[in-house]
């Protein structure tokens, strides 16, 4: 095992034994749902940077996999929507985290009459070698884990997720990204990498890695401020590094011949005199009605130079629907 992965195990072993609220700064409020009560220790062990739980991914009784279980909060949230024995699988490589998560889930049983720990199947295993058969999962998720991996390990982890997902299955991810150049002295600090501070890569590089393993559709659902790394705190820096967190859904759709459909929140609006505009490529724009479009379609429409079509900038908050 690589030295940086061993350092990561040590960090999260300690985080399991001594919960650290500030270990990873979540940038989204914890869901408030009817009859969902989260144990205080589970909440303190929420080592994520966003959320991977979205109701629109969870219809039709999906089989769910969550990798890097932390204190179990997102396992509990997924179970809230499934409520069947073994419908949610959690995988973690840290024994102490697995033990702590089991204890938190038992406490969650006492706080939530609807919940049974039997809803969740926790397994020892690595994101780089998942203890799962091919094409057995509908929804897979990870929160603030994959950014820890160096490039080749990240590609391996993404391939593993792709392998275990059923066709059209969904991989939901939340990770830090940064458009700023992070010096090697910071990147190669194993502890900073384990703390989700030095492994952030540019968003486009992140998307390219996801699509390189075969995902044909990618949705950028949220993008928020996360951290500033300053020279005052990190002597290896000469200027501030701005880090954001993103929430992404990658769908195991077939890869289109002209490349993946990546939705970053762009929309096309036709405001001409006709009721509709048809680009004869499968996209029908209704008069004065915004249509969510992937970046590829947005560029193709922009290339038409049509005076009555407006293409919005990326919002990085895509919420469904659209051209593909």
What would you call each of these model-derived segments?
Residues 25-63, 74-81:
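Conserved alpha-helix/loop element of class I SAM-dependent methyltransferases that forms part
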Residues 138-152:
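A short SAM/SAH-binding and catalytic strip from SAM-dependent methyltransferases
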Residues 155-170:
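A short glycine-rich, Lys/Arg-flanked "PGG" loop and its adjoining helix->strand segment in the class I
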């Amino acid at each position: 095992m690589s030295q940086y992965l061993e350092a990561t195990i040590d960090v999260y072993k300690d985080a399991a034994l001594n919960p650290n609220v500030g270990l990873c700064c979540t940038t989204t409020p914890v869901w408030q749902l009817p009859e969902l009560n989260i144990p205080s220790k589970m909440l303190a062990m929420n080592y994520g940077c966003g959320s991977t739980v979205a109701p629109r991914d969870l219809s039709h009784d999906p089989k769910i996999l969550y990798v890097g279980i932390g204190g179990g909060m997102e396992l509990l949230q997924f179970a809230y929507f499934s409520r069947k024995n073994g419908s949610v699988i959690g995988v973690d490589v840290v024994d102490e985290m697995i033990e702590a998560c089991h204890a938190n889930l038992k406490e969650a049983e006492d706080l939530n009459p609807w919940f049974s720990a039997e809803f969740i199947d926790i397994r020892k295993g690595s994101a780089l070698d998942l203890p799962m058969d091919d094409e057995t999962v509908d929804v897979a998720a990870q929160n603030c884990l994959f950014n820890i991996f160096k490039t080749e390990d990240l590609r391996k982890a993404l391939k593993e997720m792709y392998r275990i997902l059923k066709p059209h299955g969904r991989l939901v991810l939340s990770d830090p990204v940064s458009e700023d150049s992070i010096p090697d002295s910071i990147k190669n600090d194993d502890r900073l990498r384990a703390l989700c501070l030095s492994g952030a890569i540019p968003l486009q590089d992140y998307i390219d890695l996801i699509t390189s393993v075969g995902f044909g559709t990618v949705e950028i659902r949220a993008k928020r401020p996360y951290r500033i790394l300053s020279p005052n705190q990190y002597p290896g820096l000469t200027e501030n590094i701005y880090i954001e967190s993103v929430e992404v859904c990658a769908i195991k759709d077939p890869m289109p011949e002209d490349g993946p459909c990546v939705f970053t929140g762009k929309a096309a609006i036709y405001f001409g005199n006709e009721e509709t505009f048809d680009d004869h490529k499968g996209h029908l724009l209704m008069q004065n009605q915004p249509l969510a479009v992937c970046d590829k379609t947005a560029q193709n429409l922009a290339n038409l130079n049509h005076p009555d079509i407006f293409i919005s900038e990326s919002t990085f908050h895509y919420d469904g629907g659209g051209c593909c």
